[in-house]
A protein has these predicted regions:
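Jelly-roll (double-stranded beta-helix
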Residues: 1-81, 92-307
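N-terminal extracellular ligand-recognition/capping segment immediately after the signal peptide
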Residues: 87-91
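Ferredoxin-like iron-sulfur electron-transfer modules
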Residues: 84
């Protein structure tokens, strides 16, 4: 449970971020699936899952193609460097990444019975080909589906396979309910600078309970910690997270103290340098954080996941 220097880690695996998917898992053994995705990555497939996805663009810009509801025309959501975006559950989406760009994507572990889908559309936005699968590591699971589609009659003819065959679109799509509200990406650096200019420090919800509507309906809870000018080194109260806790030190330095539930001591302190990330396991720990003056850290949990 030590911090990982994110930029150093990305440089160490950059050569592995290659088509057709370009994913590399940073954390994946527990509740959060945290991955880094590199370009070029221009895809024709659309991914669908039953949970939300958290996008944060680290290097360069990307575009996220989405289908807001069944039969609707595709839309483009630009996500620029430094911006964060939460994609609502069940929305078909196709990430488009240019060469030299790097982004960070977080998904939750799948609940019992949940299935992911990978699909391709015809020009009239009806489904041409679809496969469903139990998802553990997208970086490994998408490639064989893409290869099967590329070798399929559906790709050659532009007609979907008959019902019952591999790739046949389902007759009733429970993965795709009515379109949820979409919230535009947030530029984190701009948001933090604006918060400081208005004297907002401490803990502020960005998504989830306590966040401005409609971001308050998110299943993710994403909280910003900003260090105050006059309270450097002040610790927050001890909190028991609702599950795995992910921390990303965006600007300057901070620290996190971790102790087992039931202990009364100060816990074990870990320094968070700029661009460090840390994953605290679920269930047995309490945490508190401290930010130096003007520092900015993101805290991510997903209360929907049961411990």
């Amino acid at each position: 449970m030590n911090p990982t220097p994110l930029k150093v880690w990305i440089d160490s695996i950059r050569s592995l971020l290659c088509p057709p998917v370009g994913n590399k898992l940073l954390f994946g053994a527990g509740q959060h699936k945290v991955m880094v995705v590199g370009g070029p990555n221009v895809r024709t497939d659309y991914h669908v899952e039953a949970g939300e996805e958290f996008f944060l663009q680290l290097e360069g810009d990307m575009e996220l193609l989405i289908i807001p509801r069944a039969g609707a025309e595709g839309l483009v959501i630009p996500i620029r460097e430094g911006e964060a975006f939460i994609l609502p559950a069940h929305v078909p989406h196709s990430p488009q990444r240019r060469a030299g760009t790097v982004g960070f994507v977080m998904e939750r572990e799948r609940l019992p019975g949940e299935m992911d889908a990978l699909r391709w559309y015809r020009p009239n936005w009806t489904v041409l080909y679809e496969e469903r699968f139990a998802c553990v590591d997208l970086g490994k699971e998408l490639r064989p589906v893409i290869e099967r589609f590329n070798a399929s009659e559906a790709k050659r003819t532009g007609e979907p396979p008959p019902l019952g065959e591999v790739g046949a679109p389902p007759s009733n799509d429970e993965l795709e309910p009515d379109a949820p509200p979409f919230v535009q990406p947030i530029n984190l650096r701009t948001w933090a600078a604006d918060a400081r200019s208005r004297g907002i420090t401490g803990t502020t919800p960005l998504w989830g309970p306590g966040a401005p509507a409609p971001r308050d309906t998110s299943e993710y809870s994403i909280i910003a910690h900003i260090g105050a000018e006059n309270s450097e080194g002040k610790w927050s109260a001890w909190v028991k997270p609702p599950g795995e806790l992910f921390l990303y030190q965006r600007e300057l330095w901070g620290a996190v103290a971790v102790r087992r539930v039931g202990d009364s001591g100060d816990g074990e302190e870990r320094v968070l340098k700029e661009n460090d990330v840390l994953l605290v396991p679920a269930g047995a720990f309490e945490v508190r954080v401290s930010m130096e003056a003007n520092a900015f850290c993101l805290e991510v949990t997903n209360p929907r996941i049961k411990q």
